[in-house]
Amino acid sequence: VSKMLIYRYFGSLEDLIAQYIIQRDYWVNIPTEIPGKNELNAFVKDMFREQIRQLREDKMLIRLYRWELSVNNPIVEQIRRKREENGIKLIEFISRISGVPFSQIQFLATMISSSITYLAMFGDVGKVYNGYDFKTDDSWEQLEKGINLIVDKWI
């Protein structure tokens, strides 16, 4: 790719990277409206399952998440703000519909979503974590089962 084209259309390489993240990031693009109480449990499970699927399929996004952790600029801050806004909206909806206190939903959602992201980045470099090799389908299936168990007890 020509540097001239990058600068013409995106302004800088960092702007190009940010646009890729904005278009692909699960939490930036997630719909912030959720179903009723009867479908809430399945919705939350599907939400985390989709985050896993996306990160397992998009290796470039995982690498860009690593890059994002190493920089602090206005574009990255914009991405982080959008994730935060969407996350808080979802937590508020889930709390209101489920009757579970906001702080509990907030904490559990933070633990689960950050664990998925970390394990996807960790698995990308071929490491084993607590005996699980996150390059394998079996390890990810075990993680999904664990998430489902948490969601079942929580919502």
At which residue positions do the language-model features occur?
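Hydrophobic/aromatic-rich alpha-helical bundle segments in the mid-to-C-terminal region
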Residues: 94-148
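Short, basic, alpha-helical segments at the C-terminal edge of helix-turn-helix-like DNA-binding modules
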Residues: 21-28
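Amphipathic alpha-helical packing segments from all-alpha helical-bundle domains
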Residues: 28-34, 73-99, 106-110, 141, ...
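Short, Lys/Arg-enriched C-terminal cap helix and immediately downstream tail that follows
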Residues: 17-19
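Helix-turn-helix
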Residues: 1-15
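N-terminal hydrophobic signal/anchor transmembrane helix of membrane proteins
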Residues: 43-57, 139-155
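Hydrophobic alpha-helical connector segments
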Residues: 31-57, 61, 100-112
